[in-house]
C-alpha cells in the first residue's frame, strides 16, 4: 500500500476547530512546504508512525531533543520509575541537584544552574538576569537567530547600520522592541560599530553560537572569540543560547567545541530526554543574584519536575558512553556529504552546513554564512523535495530554515535508504 494521509487530513480538520491553525506550535502546520501535516501515532528508535499507518525515518526528532531516538528503553524506564513515586511535588528533590551537577560537569562556564520548563523561559530569564546585574537595558541579538517567543526577542532588523529592532509579531510593544538591537551573524566589524555607538548601554549579546533557526550556519573563524573579547571590553554579558546545540554538537555544546566561555548559557531539548526541560546558568557571581539568594526574580511551578529530571539524567548518562558522539558525527557527516554529492552530480544547487549531529541543506548555489545568504534558498523547491521525501518515508523538518537531526538510533542502512530516496526525489524535480 502506498502513502495514505486521509486520517491525518480528518484529524487536522478536527484540530482546526479547537487549536489555532490546528497546531500548538506554528511550524507543525506544514504551511511553508505546501501541504497539511501528518498526525503521529508513535515513535520507536529512529522511526515514526502516523495515524494512517505510514512509517518514516525521523530526522526531526521532536526538533532535536531525542538524540538517543524515540522511546529509548532506559529513558522510558526512568520515567516510569519516577512516575510511580509521584508526578510533581513543587518541592526540592535530590535528582534536581544531580542533574545540575551533570550539566555543570559538561559546561565548565556554568558554575550554577536554574532549571526551568522551556527554552523561551530560559532565554527570558537570562536576559532579565543580564539586565539586573549590569543595570543596563539594551540587548543585541542576531537576525535569523531564534530565542523563543519572549517579547524582546520577537524582533527583526530595522534599517540602517545601527539596527534597532522592530516587532515581528503584533502584540510586541514598540517600546520593548526599541531596547533590542539586531546585528548580522558572523559580522564582527558591524558589531564593533554598534558597540562604539552605544556599548555602555548594552546589557548583553545573545546568540546561537551555531545557528539552527535559520538553518545550520557555522561561526566563521574568529567570530565567537572576537565577540567574547568585545563584550568583555564593554562590560556586557555574553549569552550563548545552546538550547539546540547543547549536548548535540558535542557533549559540551558549541562552547566546548569552539572553546569559548560565555557568561550565561541557556539549555533545553536534549537535557530533558524528550520531556519539557530547559535551564540557564553561568558564573556564580551572576547566578547568586537569582531569587531567593538574590533580588532578580524567577520562579516556576513545574521547574525541576521529577519526571523530566529522571528522563534528562538518564539521557545524559547514556551520552557519556564512549564513542557516542564520534558515531553521531560520522553518520551525520556521511548523510550531509552524501546529499551534497548527489545534488552536485544531478546539477542541483545545494549548500550543506554540518556540525556534530545536525546539518542543513540549503537549496542555493552560494555559501550560507548569515541570514541574507540563507534567504537566497529556493523555498518552493525545498517544499517539493520535502513532499517527495515524506511520501517515500523520510520525515524532514517542514521548513527550509530548520536543521536535520540524527540520533544514536539511526543506522548506516537508514542513511543508505535516505540517500537513495533523495536521489530519486531530486531526479524527479528535474
From Swiss-Prot:
Cofactor names = pyridoxal 5'-phosphate
List residues modified as N6-(pyridoxal phosphate)lysine. 269
EC id: 5.4.3.8
- Which segment of the chain is annotated as a signal peptide? none
Q: What class of enzyme is it?
A: isomerase
**Any one annotated GO CC term:** cytoplasm
- Cite the entry's keywords alphabetically: Cytoplasm, Isomerase, Porphyrin biosynthesis, Pyridoxal phosphate
Pfam families given in the database record:
Aminotran_3
Can you provide one Gene Ontology molecular function annotated for this UniProt record?
A: glutamate-1-semialdehyde 2,1-aminomutase activity
User: What GO terms describe the biological role, i.e. biological process, of this protein?
Assistant: protoporphyrinogen IX biosynthetic process
Instruction: Identify the metabolic or biological route this protein is part of.
Output: Porphyrin-containing compound metabolism; protoporphyrin-IX biosynthesis; 5-aminolevulinate from L-glutamyl-tRNA(Glu): step 2/2
- Where is it chiefly localized? cytoplasm
The chemistry this enzyme catalyses reads: (S)-4-amino-5-oxopentanoate = 5-aminolevulinate
Q: Where in the cell is it found?
A: Cytoplasm
What does the subunit comment say?
A: Homodimer.
Which family would the database say this protein is a member of? Belongs to the class-III pyridoxal-phosphate-dependent aminotransferase family. HemL subfamily.
Name the record gives this protein = Glutamate-1-semialdehyde 2,1-aminomutase
Q: Which organism is it from?
A: Desulfitobacterium hafniense (strain Y51)
Tell me the organism's taxonomic lineage.
Bacteria, Bacillati, Bacillota, Clostridia, Eubacteriales
Q: What's the encoding gene here?
A: hemL
Amino acid at each position: 500500500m502506498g502513502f495514505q494521509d486521509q486520517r491525518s487530513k480528518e484529524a487536522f480538520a478536527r484540530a482546526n476547530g479547537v487549536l489555532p491553525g490546528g497546531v500548538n506550535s506554528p511550524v507543525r502546520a506544514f504551511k511553508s512546504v505546501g501541504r497539511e501535516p501528518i498526525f503521529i501515532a508513535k515513535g520507536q528508535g529512529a522511526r515514526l508512525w502516523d495515524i494512517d499507518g505510514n512509517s518514516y525515518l525521523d530526522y526531526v526528532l521532536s526538533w532535536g531533543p531525542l538524540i538517543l531516538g524515540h522511546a529509548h528503553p532506559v529513558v522510558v524506564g526512568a520515567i516510569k520509575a519516577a512516575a510511580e513515586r509521584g508526578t510533581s511535588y513543587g518541592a526540592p528533590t535530590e535528582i534536581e541537584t544531580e542533574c545540575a551537577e551533570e550539566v555543570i560537569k559538561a559546561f565548565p562556564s556554568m558554575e550554577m544552574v536554574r532549571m526551568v520548563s522551556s527554552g523561551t523561559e530560559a532565554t527570558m530569564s537570562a536576559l532579565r538576569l543580564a539586565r539586573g546585574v549590569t543595570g543596563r537595558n539594551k540587548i543585541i541579538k542576531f537576525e535569523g537567530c531564534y530565542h523563543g517567543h519572549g517579547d524582546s526577542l520577537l524582533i527583526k532588523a530595522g534599517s540602517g547600520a545601527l539596527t534597532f529592532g522592530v516587532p515581528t509579531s503584533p502584540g510586541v510593544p514598540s517600546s520593548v522592541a526599541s531596547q533590542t538591537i539586531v546585528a548580522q551573524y558572523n559580522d564582527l566589524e558591524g558589531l564593533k560599530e554598534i558597540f562604539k555607538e552605544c556599548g555602555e548601554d548594552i546589557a548583553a549579546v545573545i546568540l546561537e553560537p551555531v545557528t539552527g533557526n535559520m538553518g545550520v550556519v557555522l561561526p566563521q573563524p574568529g567570530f565567537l572569540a572576537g565577540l567574547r573579547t568585545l563584550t568583555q571590553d564593554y562590560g556586557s554579558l555574553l549569552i550563548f543560547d545552546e538550547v539546540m546545540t547543547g549536548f548535540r554538537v558535542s557533549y559540551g555544546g558549541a562552547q566546548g567545541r569552539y572553546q569559548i566561555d560565555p557568561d550565561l548559557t541557556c539549555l533545553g531539548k536534549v537535557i530533558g530526554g524528550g520531556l519539557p526541560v530547559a535551564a540557564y546558568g553561568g558564573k556564580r557571581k551572576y547566578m547568586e543574584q537569582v531569587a531567593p539568594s538574590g533580588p532578580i526574580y524567577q520562579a516556576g511551578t513545574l521547574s525541576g519536575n521529577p519526571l523530566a529530571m529522571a528522563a534528562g539524567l538518564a539521557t545524559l548518562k547514556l551520552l557519556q558512553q564512549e564513542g557516542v558522539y564520534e558515531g553521531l558525527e560520522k553518520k551525520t557527516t556521511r548523510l550531509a556529504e552524501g546529499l551534497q554529492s548527489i545534488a552536485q552530480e544531478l546539477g542541483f544547487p545545494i549548500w550543506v552546513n554540518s556540525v556534530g549531529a545536525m546539518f542543513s541543506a540549503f537549496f542555493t548555489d552560494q555559501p550560507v554564512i548569515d541570514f541574507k545568504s540563507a534567504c537566497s534558498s529556493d523555498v518552493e523547491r525545498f517544499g517539493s523535495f520535502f513532499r517527495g521525501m515524506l511520501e517515500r518515508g523520510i520525515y524532514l523538518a517542514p521548513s527550509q530554515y530548520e536543521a536535520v537531526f540524527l540520533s544514536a538510533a539511526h543506522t548506516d542502512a537508514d542513511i543508505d535508504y535516505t540517500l537513495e530516496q533523495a536521489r530519486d526525489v531530486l531526479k524527479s524535480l528535474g
